[in-house]
Design a protein with these regions (language model features):
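Short hydrophobic segments within beta-strands
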Residues: 125-127
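Conserved active-site and cofactor/substrate-binding residues in soluble primary-metabolism enzymes
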Residues: 1, 20, 47, 51, ...
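Short, well-ordered beta-strand elements within core beta-sheets of diverse protein domains
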Residues: 24, 43-45, 159-160
Length: 172
């Protein structure tokens, strides 16, 4: 049995891009493809946008990453802008959608453990056929058998409402 050095997480299509140009991918032979995903999930940025390249270069010249052990004037300023322009009171930066969903799960459970005192409120409702990520909690939050296969036992505490069926969600 041979295994790819790059773990296969999706069935791969035949396109093998080596470069991107705004909303296009360019393969090894120079063929251009319109990229309707323009990245995926948290990276919907397109390809080679000069403004983004400039911002990344500027940041890379000053500071690449700061642990949560330290304060970050730039991070704090961005968090304040987000709080000022949204419903949020606080912000937690993550690097992936799965991490964001994990944080939402933990925040909801922590609220009931620490804030309202009803530690028995641990069940969360998610919708059928939804994708939440590839961590154990986000796989457990999905009702898709293909996501569960090979990862049993799942984490407890999720109920699945039929998508687009508010009455079913209310009944849970």
């Amino acid at each position: 049995m041979s295994i790819s050095p790059l773990m296969p997480v999706y069935p791969r299509c035949g396109v093998r891009p080596v470069k991107g140009d705004h909303c296009h991918l360019i393969d090894e032979d120079g063929t251009r493809y319109l990229d309707f995903a323009s990245g995926i999930a948290v990276n919907l940025l397109g390809h080679s946008h000069s403004g983004l390249i400039g911002a990344i270069q500027k940041q890379a010249e000053t500071l690449m990453h700061v642990s949560n052990l330290y304060g970050s004037p730039q991070g704090e300023a961005l968090a304040q802008r987000l709080v000022d322009k949204t419903f949020a009171d606080t912000v937690f930066f993550t690097n992936s959608g799965a991490e964001a969903v994990e944080t939402a799960i933990k925040t909801a459970r922590a609220y009931h453990q620490h804030e309202d005192g009803d530690a028995n409120r641990t069940e969360l409702i998610t919708f059928t056929n939804a994708f939440h990520g590839r961590t154990m909690a986000t796989i457990s939050a999905s009702n898709q058998e293909k996501m569960h296969k090979g990862f049993m036992p799942l984490l407890a505490g999720f109920q699945y409402a039929e998508f687009d069926n508010l009455d079913h969600a209310k009944s849970l």
